[in-house]
From Swiss-Prot:
HAMAP family assigned: Ribosomal_bL9
Protein name, UniProt field: Large ribosomal subunit protein bL9
GO biological process, one term: translation
Gene: rplI
GO cellular component assignments: ribonucleoprotein complex; ribosome
Gene3D superfamilies per the UniProt record, alphabetical: Ribosomal protein L9, C-terminal domain, Ribosomal protein L9, N-terminal domain
């Protein structure tokens, strides 16, 4: 299916690009989230009229994301979890736990935006984690896992 991107999508394209994607990806993800539209002649003509408005909206989203990114930069977030004597956690700290802790601090971050390169955290200590606030803005934060006695 050919679609017009209404905003920048990671690994796919930028605003206004006409790209070919699998039907399910378009129908189940891109179109319902208003990230894309079917590339019909009417849609392409409508997009040409609305392009300036959409670019302005994208610039505003980017500016807001950069503001959140600067607040998040070098943030140290403490998360308590039950741990054994050797420092291993009973369970783990996942991206869901980190997103909940960030929401408690006043940030609106989705759990899918938390990128953990080494997977869930299973040890007590400081761990670097990347938070993708926007496709162009990634903030590095430190998660300090504090062990609580079981």
């Amino acid at each position: 299916m050919q679609i017009i991107l209404l905003e920048k999508v990671t690994n796919l394209g930028n605003l206004g690009d006409v790209v070919r994607v699998k039907d399910g990806f378009a129908r189940n993800f891109l179109i319902p989230q208003r990230k894309a539209r079917r590339a019909t002649e009417a849609a392409i003509a409508d997009f040409a009229v609305r392009r300036a408005e959409l670019e302005k909206l994208a610039a505003e989203k980017l500016a807001a994301a950069e503001a959140v990114g600067t607040k998040l930069k070098d943030l140290v977030l403490e998360i308590g979890q039950k741990a054994g004597v050797d420092g291993r956690l009973f369970g783990s700290v996942t991206n869901h736990d980190i997103a909940d802790a960030l929401k408690a601090k006043g940030f609106t971050i989705e759990k899918s935006s938390v990128r953990m390169p080494t997977g869930p955290l299973k040890m007590v200590g400081d761990h670097p984690v990347a938070v993708a606030v926007h496709t162009d803005v990634v903030a590095d934060i430190t998660i300090r896992v504090v062990g609580e006695q079981a």
